[in-house]
Structure formats: C-alpha cells, structure tokens
C-alpha cells in the first residue's frame, strides 16, 4: 500500500506539472528517492524550486536536494507561536534568510545572560512582533541558536539576514 501511495503522489506531481515543493528537507530527500525509484524519469517532472524548513538542514543537504530533484532549494523559517506564513525566507543568492523586519524585531542574545550579542555572533534568536494583534510576543525566546548579519545582500535587499539554525539552547528534541 505504501509503495502505491508513493506512486500516486509522484504521478500527481508529474501530471499536474508541480513546479514548487514546500516541506521539510528530510521529506524532500525521501521524495527524491521515491521519484528515482518510480517509472517516471526525473526529466519529465517540472519541479524547479523548493522551500524547505521546520527542521535544521545543511549546505550538503541543499546540494543533494538540488542535484537529486534538479531544483533550486531555499531555506524558510517560521514559528508556530509567532503565526503567519513564516518569519523569513532566502532570496536567490541563498546567503541567509531575510527576516521580515516590518513585522518582527529580531535579536540574538546570550542564552545564559539574555544580553544582546554583537552582530555575527551566535546566540539565541529572540523575536518581538510588531504587527501581531491580540497576542503580541515581546522578546519571545525561540531557543534556536543562530546569528544575524546586517550587511546588504547581493540581491539588493537590506533586511537583516539570519544564518542557519545551528542547534538549540534547551537541547529539546521533537520525536
């Protein structure tokens, strides 16, 4: 039954001409494996782009996804607690996640002292929502460890960019 479901999903992506894929990077690697095992050659799929998040992933995983699915793979970031379609996403330069500063004020703090760290240093990501009504978040601790850069991106955007998630300050695992 599972093999049949995989074939149906792959067939639907093929038949509807899906050009984009949004999921976790680990699920995208699983999809790549099933597509390569299917009777439909990868060249017949129209996939061109993937937006991946909800779990940490590496540059090696990005390269593997881009090679195995013949797509451009972009990192996205969001939090259930913050709501909305996310907090930021990578641009075509793939050099950090642009955070939407018109809606969120990001900070990096030392997880032990909660004091701000210098730009570029790794610490815990903290958000204050600027436009969320009803339940605004003030200095919400994400427990995600990363860094921020305020340098202008090669794409021309000036929004702060977040580096990859490097770990958690609370060592929490979701199983």
Model regions: which residues?
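Active-site glycine/GP-rich loop and adjacent strand/helix microenvironment
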Residues: 9-175
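Short, small-residue-biased leader/transition segments that mark boundaries at the very start
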Residues: 1-8
């Amino acid at each position: 039954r599972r093999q049949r479901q995989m074939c149906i999903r792959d067939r639907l992506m093929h038949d509807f001409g899906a050009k984009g894929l949004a999921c976790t990077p680990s699920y995208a690697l699983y999809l790549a494996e099933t597509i390569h095992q299917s009777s439909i050659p990868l060249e017949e799929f129209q996939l061109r782009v993937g937006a991946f998040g909800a779990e940490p992933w590496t540059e090696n995983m990005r390269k593997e996804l881009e090679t195995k699915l013949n797509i451009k793979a972009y990192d996205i970031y969001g939090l259930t607690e913050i709501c909305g379609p996310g907090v930021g996403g990578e641009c075509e330069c793939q050099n950090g996640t642009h955070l939407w500063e018109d809606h969120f004020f990001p900070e990096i703090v030392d997880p032990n002292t909660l004091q701000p760290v210098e730009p570029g240093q790794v610490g815990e990501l903290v958000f204050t929502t600027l436009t969320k009504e009803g339940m605004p978040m003030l200095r919400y601790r994400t427990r995600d460890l990363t860094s921020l850069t305020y340098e202008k991106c090669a794409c021309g955007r000036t929004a702060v960019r977040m580096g990859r998630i490097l770990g958690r300050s609370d060592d929490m695992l979701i199983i």
